Amino acid sequence: AQSLSFSFTKFDPNQEDLIFQGTATSKLDSAGNPVSSSAGRVLYSAPLRLWEDSAVLTSFDPTIYIFTNYTSRIADGLAFIAPPDSVISYHGGFLGLFPNAAESGIAESNVVAVEFDTDYLNPDYGDPNYIHIGIDVNSIRSKVTASWDWQNGKIATAHISYNSVSKRLSVTTYYPGRGKPATSYDIELHTVLPEWVRVGLSASTGQNIERNTVHSWSFTSSLWTNVAKVGVASISG
Protein backbone atom coordinates (compact mmCIF):
# COMPACT_ATOMS: atom_id res chain seq x y z
CA ALA A 1 0.00 0.00 0.00
CA GLN A 2 1.09 3.55 -0.71
CA SER A 3 -0.31 6.62 0.96
CA LEU A 4 -0.08 10.37 0.89
CA SER A 5 -1.16 12.47 3.84
CA PHE A 6 -0.60 16.08 4.84
CA SER A 7 -2.21 18.96 6.69
CA PHE A 8 -1.26 22.63 6.47
CA THR A 9 -2.47 25.49 8.65
CA LYS A 10 0.07 27.96 7.28
CA PHE A 11 1.66 28.45 3.90
CA ASP A 12 5.26 29.59 3.62
CA PRO A 13 7.22 29.76 0.33
CA ASN A 14 10.16 28.25 2.20
CA GLN A 15 8.25 25.08 3.12
CA GLU A 16 9.89 22.12 1.40
CA ASP A 17 6.60 20.26 0.94
CA LEU A 18 4.96 23.04 -1.08
CA ILE A 19 5.60 24.41 -4.56
CA PHE A 20 4.60 28.06 -5.03
CA GLN A 21 4.02 29.30 -8.57
CA GLY A 22 3.17 32.65 -10.10
CA THR A 23 1.68 35.12 -7.61
CA ALA A 24 0.72 32.54 -4.98
CA THR A 25 3.20 34.11 -2.55
CA SER A 26 0.85 37.02 -1.77
CA LYS A 27 2.00 39.37 -4.50
CA LEU A 28 0.69 42.77 -3.45
CA ASP A 29 0.95 46.29 -4.80
CA SER A 30 2.21 49.27 -2.78
CA ALA A 31 -1.23 49.71 -1.19
CA GLY A 32 -1.26 46.12 0.04
CA ASN A 33 -3.71 44.83 -2.57
CA PRO A 34 -3.43 41.77 -4.83
CA VAL A 35 -2.25 42.50 -8.36
CA SER A 36 -4.64 42.41 -11.32
CA SER A 37 -4.17 40.09 -14.33
CA SER A 38 -2.16 37.54 -12.38
CA ALA A 39 -2.34 33.84 -11.50
CA GLY A 40 -0.83 31.70 -8.76
CA ARG A 41 -0.73 28.09 -7.59
CA VAL A 42 0.30 26.12 -4.54
CA LEU A 43 1.05 22.44 -5.21
CA TYR A 44 2.01 19.67 -2.84
CA SER A 45 5.55 18.70 -3.82
CA ALA A 46 5.15 14.91 -3.73
CA PRO A 47 3.24 13.44 -6.68
CA LEU A 48 0.08 11.46 -6.08
CA ARG A 49 -0.47 8.06 -7.70
CA LEU A 50 -4.02 7.99 -9.03
CA TRP A 51 -4.13 4.58 -10.63
CA GLU A 52 -2.16 1.47 -11.50
CA ASP A 53 -2.27 -0.86 -14.52
CA SER A 54 -4.84 1.41 -16.24
CA ALA A 55 -7.38 0.83 -13.45
CA VAL A 56 -8.58 3.70 -11.31
CA LEU A 57 -10.46 3.08 -8.08
CA THR A 58 -9.83 6.29 -6.20
CA SER A 59 -11.49 7.78 -3.13
CA PHE A 60 -10.54 11.20 -1.77
CA ASP A 61 -11.89 13.80 0.64
CA PRO A 62 -10.07 17.16 0.50
CA THR A 63 -11.06 19.72 3.12
CA ILE A 64 -10.13 23.38 2.62
CA TYR A 65 -10.95 26.48 4.67
CA ILE A 66 -11.19 29.48 2.35
CA PHE A 67 -11.44 33.20 3.08
CA THR A 68 -12.30 35.45 0.12
CA ASN A 69 -12.37 39.23 0.31
CA TYR A 70 -12.90 41.97 -2.25
CA THR A 71 -13.33 45.72 -1.88
CA SER A 72 -14.83 46.84 -5.21
CA ARG A 73 -15.96 44.21 -7.72
CA ILE A 74 -15.53 40.46 -7.27
CA ALA A 75 -12.84 38.71 -9.28
CA ASP A 76 -12.46 35.13 -10.47
CA GLY A 77 -12.22 32.75 -7.52
CA LEU A 78 -10.21 29.70 -6.52
CA ALA A 79 -9.93 26.04 -7.58
CA PHE A 80 -8.76 22.74 -6.13
CA ILE A 81 -6.79 21.07 -8.91
CA ALA A 82 -5.21 17.80 -9.98
CA PRO A 83 -3.05 18.81 -12.96
CA PRO A 84 -0.74 16.46 -14.89
CA ASP A 85 2.02 19.07 -14.93
CA SER A 86 3.23 22.12 -13.05
CA VAL A 87 2.81 24.67 -15.83
CA ILE A 88 0.70 27.63 -14.78
CA SER A 89 -1.67 28.96 -17.44
CA TYR A 90 -3.80 32.03 -18.14
CA HIS A 91 -5.12 34.48 -15.55
CA GLY A 92 -8.62 35.95 -15.17
CA GLY A 93 -11.53 33.55 -15.55
CA PHE A 94 -9.18 30.77 -16.65
CA LEU A 95 -8.03 30.42 -13.00
CA GLY A 96 -4.42 29.72 -14.03
CA LEU A 97 -5.56 26.34 -15.41
CA PHE A 98 -6.44 26.82 -19.07
CA PRO A 99 -5.02 28.73 -22.05
CA ASN A 100 -6.76 31.82 -23.39
CA ALA A 101 -8.92 30.64 -26.30
CA ALA A 102 -8.78 34.09 -27.90
CA GLU A 103 -4.99 33.77 -28.16
CA SER A 104 -4.48 30.03 -28.61
CA GLY A 105 -7.71 28.94 -30.28
CA ILE A 106 -8.44 26.46 -27.48
CA ALA A 107 -9.53 26.77 -23.86
CA GLU A 108 -8.73 23.22 -22.82
CA SER A 109 -6.07 21.44 -20.80
CA ASN A 110 -5.81 17.96 -19.27
CA VAL A 111 -6.87 18.80 -15.74
CA VAL A 112 -9.61 18.01 -13.25
CA ALA A 113 -10.61 20.92 -11.03
CA VAL A 114 -13.25 21.95 -8.53
CA GLU A 115 -13.89 25.67 -8.86
CA PHE A 116 -15.25 28.13 -6.34
CA ASP A 117 -16.31 30.81 -8.80
CA THR A 118 -17.07 34.24 -7.39
CA ASP A 119 -17.31 35.94 -10.81
CA TYR A 120 -20.33 34.64 -12.71
CA LEU A 121 -20.30 37.35 -15.40
CA ASN A 122 -18.44 35.15 -17.88
CA PRO A 123 -21.01 33.85 -20.42
CA ASP A 124 -18.19 32.92 -22.81
CA TYR A 125 -17.06 30.35 -20.23
CA GLY A 126 -20.52 28.82 -19.93
CA ASP A 127 -21.01 30.20 -16.42
CA PRO A 128 -24.50 30.23 -14.88
CA ASN A 129 -25.89 33.59 -13.84
CA TYR A 130 -24.90 33.24 -10.19
CA ILE A 131 -21.90 32.67 -7.92
CA HIS A 132 -21.29 28.94 -7.95
CA ILE A 133 -19.21 25.87 -7.30
CA GLY A 134 -18.41 23.71 -10.31
CA ILE A 135 -16.53 20.65 -11.52
CA ASP A 136 -14.25 21.18 -14.53
CA VAL A 137 -12.86 18.40 -16.70
CA ASN A 138 -10.39 19.48 -19.40
CA SER A 139 -12.22 22.77 -19.94
CA ILE A 140 -13.13 25.97 -18.11
CA ARG A 141 -16.76 25.18 -19.01
CA SER A 142 -17.95 23.29 -15.94
CA LYS A 143 -19.59 19.89 -16.36
CA VAL A 144 -21.94 20.64 -13.45
CA THR A 145 -22.53 23.63 -11.16
CA ALA A 146 -24.47 24.55 -8.03
CA SER A 147 -25.34 27.93 -6.59
CA TRP A 148 -22.95 28.98 -3.80
CA ASP A 149 -24.22 31.10 -0.92
CA TRP A 150 -20.91 32.97 -0.87
CA GLN A 151 -20.23 35.37 2.03
CA ASN A 152 -17.63 38.07 1.43
CA GLY A 153 -15.06 38.26 4.22
CA LYS A 154 -16.09 35.01 5.95
CA ILE A 155 -14.36 31.62 6.11
CA ALA A 156 -16.00 28.81 4.13
CA THR A 157 -15.43 25.08 4.52
CA ALA A 158 -15.04 23.18 1.25
CA HIS A 159 -15.21 19.39 1.19
CA ILE A 160 -14.38 17.42 -1.95
CA SER A 161 -14.64 13.66 -2.37
CA TYR A 162 -14.09 11.05 -5.06
CA ASN A 163 -15.69 7.64 -4.54
CA SER A 164 -13.67 4.81 -6.07
CA VAL A 165 -16.65 2.49 -6.52
CA SER A 166 -19.23 4.88 -7.96
CA LYS A 167 -16.56 6.97 -9.79
CA ARG A 168 -18.32 10.06 -8.44
CA LEU A 169 -16.54 13.37 -7.79
CA SER A 170 -18.50 15.51 -5.32
CA VAL A 171 -18.12 18.92 -3.72
CA THR A 172 -19.93 20.82 -1.00
CA THR A 173 -19.06 24.14 0.60
CA TYR A 174 -20.68 25.99 3.46
CA TYR A 175 -20.51 28.59 6.20
CA PRO A 176 -21.47 27.93 9.84
CA GLY A 177 -25.22 28.01 10.30
CA ARG A 178 -26.02 28.19 6.58
CA GLY A 179 -27.00 25.74 3.85
CA LYS A 180 -24.60 23.30 2.18
CA PRO A 181 -24.76 23.58 -1.62
CA ALA A 182 -23.41 20.50 -3.35
CA THR A 183 -22.90 19.04 -6.80
CA SER A 184 -21.31 15.91 -8.26
CA TYR A 185 -20.08 14.42 -11.53
CA ASP A 186 -19.29 10.83 -12.53
CA ILE A 187 -15.85 10.39 -14.07
CA GLU A 188 -13.17 7.73 -14.47
CA LEU A 189 -9.99 9.62 -13.68
CA HIS A 190 -7.67 7.35 -15.68
CA THR A 191 -9.41 8.51 -18.88
CA VAL A 192 -8.41 12.11 -18.15
CA LEU A 193 -5.28 12.14 -16.00
CA PRO A 194 -1.97 10.27 -16.05
CA GLU A 195 -1.00 7.76 -13.38
CA TRP A 196 0.89 10.40 -11.38
CA VAL A 197 -0.32 13.95 -10.74
CA ARG A 198 0.17 16.71 -8.19
CA VAL A 199 -2.68 18.18 -6.18
CA GLY A 200 -2.99 21.82 -5.28
CA LEU A 201 -4.86 25.10 -5.33
CA SER A 202 -4.99 27.70 -8.09
CA ALA A 203 -6.42 31.22 -8.27
CA SER A 204 -6.25 34.22 -10.57
CA THR A 205 -7.36 37.80 -11.16
CA GLY A 206 -8.27 39.74 -14.27
CA GLN A 207 -9.09 43.44 -14.33
CA ASN A 208 -10.79 43.03 -10.96
CA ILE A 209 -9.02 41.74 -7.87
CA GLU A 210 -9.85 39.76 -4.76
CA ARG A 211 -7.78 38.04 -2.13
CA ASN A 212 -8.28 34.28 -1.66
CA THR A 213 -6.75 33.13 1.62
CA VAL A 214 -6.50 29.42 2.44
CA HIS A 215 -6.53 29.01 6.22
CA SER A 216 -5.98 25.25 6.18
CA TRP A 217 -5.79 22.32 3.78
CA SER A 218 -5.77 18.63 4.70
CA PHE A 219 -5.30 15.64 2.43
CA THR A 220 -4.85 11.87 2.77
CA SER A 221 -4.67 9.10 0.20
CA SER A 222 -3.84 5.41 -0.10
CA LEU A 223 -3.32 3.05 -3.00
CA TRP A 224 -4.07 -0.68 -2.78
CA THR A 225 -3.85 -3.62 -5.17
CA ASN A 226 -6.51 -6.30 -4.80
CA VAL A 227 -6.26 -9.98 -5.78
CA ALA A 228 -7.25 -9.10 -9.32
CA LYS A 229 -4.37 -6.61 -9.40
CA VAL A 230 -6.67 -3.64 -9.71
CA GLY A 231 -5.19 -0.37 -8.45
CA VAL A 232 -7.25 1.34 -5.77
CA ALA A 233 -6.45 4.81 -4.48
CA SER A 234 -8.16 6.52 -1.58
CA ILE A 235 -7.59 10.22 -1.17
CA SER A 236 -8.73 12.63 1.49
CA GLY A 237 -7.72 16.21 1.45
Swiss-Prot record:
The keyword Lipoprotein does not apply. Glycans are attached at residue 69. Ca(2+) binds at residues 117, 120, 122, 127. The modification Blocked amino end (Ile) is found at residue 106. Mn(2+) binds at residues 115, 117, 127, 132. It comes from the Eukaryota. One of its GO terms (molecular function) is D-mannose binding. D-mannose/D-glucose-binding lectin. Requires Ca(2+) and Mn(2+) ions for full activity. This is Lectin. The lineage of its organism: Eukaryota, Viridiplantae, Streptophyta, Embryophyta, Tracheophyta.
